[in-house]
A protein has these predicted regions:
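Conserved structural motif at the start of ABC-family nucleotide-binding domains
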Residues: 2-4, 16-19
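The feature captures the beta-strand-to-loop junction immediately N-terminal to the Walker
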Residues: 33-35
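Helix-to-loop junction immediately C-terminal to a conserved catalytic motif
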Residues: 48
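Conserved ABC transporter NBD signature motif
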Residues: 56-64
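Conserved ABC ATPase "signature" region
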Residues: 111-128, 165
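Conserved ABC ATPase signature
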Residues: 132-136, 140
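H-loop (His-switch) and adjacent beta-strand-loop-beta switch element
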Residues: 212-226
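ABC ATPase nucleotide-binding domains
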Residues: 232, 237-259
Length: 259
């Protein structure tokens, strides 16, 4: 389990997060949504250890994140940020291998190579394997970056859980790859995985998420199962937009229609 207890965070005089608490269970797809500037990405960065100056407590398996060594943290959690660009040319297979860096000292072993090949195949990137990363489109880069973070936590942990943090992972992806991406994530959480993604598309979130967490102005407004919290009143309160929420005739899940 991953827990946040009374998290507050400020940049200068601006308070980004205000006394936010939440729990995230393994085996469930957790998605954070909210308007721009609501603190979603900052919340994710605190969980991943990228931001370490904050008030409150983050617990990995009941162990404080500030007590985890960087090497230990790197082996159990992976982060996919919004920025997919690299400042130097690498082959796609080399970028994916970057996800294995925490697991070896000098050179990758046979297991590292096997894992990268499995991930590349799973993400349908075999034809891109020897392409220069900088020549790829934005959507192709996103897929490679997802393969990289999957490679980092591909192995099932001997004890405890693995953690995957995705910050707006669907940027630049077309519809088919959005679903491929989310389906791969759903498969991953079945094996001792805590998964948290920052999302913008409410209907995709309603389709794939087990739990939704709504942030607004740095505060946790509401959280729960999509069918319980995706109501017209809550959506208007969080996003200041009028909607009609109906049952998807195919999936039975909430479907948000904008007025």
């Amino acid at each position: 389990m991953l827990r946040a207890e009374k998290i507050s965070f400020s940049v200068g005089k601006k308070q980004i997060l205000k006394n936010v608490s939440a729990s995230f269970l393994p085996g469930e797809f957790n998605m954070i949504l909210g308007p721009n500037g609501s603190g979603k990405s900052s919340f994710l960065k605190i969980f991943s250890g990228e931001i370490n100056r904050f008030q409150g407590t983050v617990l990995y398996d009941n162990k404080k994140i500030k007590e985890l060594r960087k090497e230990e943290l790197a082996k159990k959690r992976a982060v996919m940020s919004q920025q997919a660009d690299l400042g130097f040319p690498l082959l796609v297979e080399e970028v994916v291998m970057m996800g294995r860096y925490p697991h070896f000292t000098f050179n990758p072993n046979k297991k590292d190579v096997t894992i990268c090949n499995e991930v590349i195949e799973r993400m349908n990137l075999v034809e891109f394997k020897e392409r220069n990363y900088v020549t790829l489109s934005g959507g192709e880069k996103q897929r490679v970056q997802f393969a990289r973070v999957l490679a980092q936590v591909w192995e099932k942990p001997a004890d405890g859980y693995r953690y995957l943090f995705l910050d707006e992972p669907l940027n630049s992806l077309d519809i088919s790859y959005q679903h491929e991406f989310l389906q791969a994530a759903v498969e991953l959480i079945k094996d001792h995985t805590v998964l948290i993604a920052v999302m913008h598309d409410i209907n995709l979130a309603a389709h794939y998420a087990d739990n939704l967490f709504f942030l607004k102005e740095g505060e946790m407004t509401v959280h729960g199962r999509p069918k319980d919290i995706l109501t017209e009143n809550i959506i208007e309160k969080v996003f200041n937009v009028k909607t009609k929420v109906i049952e998807n005739p195919v999936t039975g899940k909430p479907l948000v229609i904008y007025n």
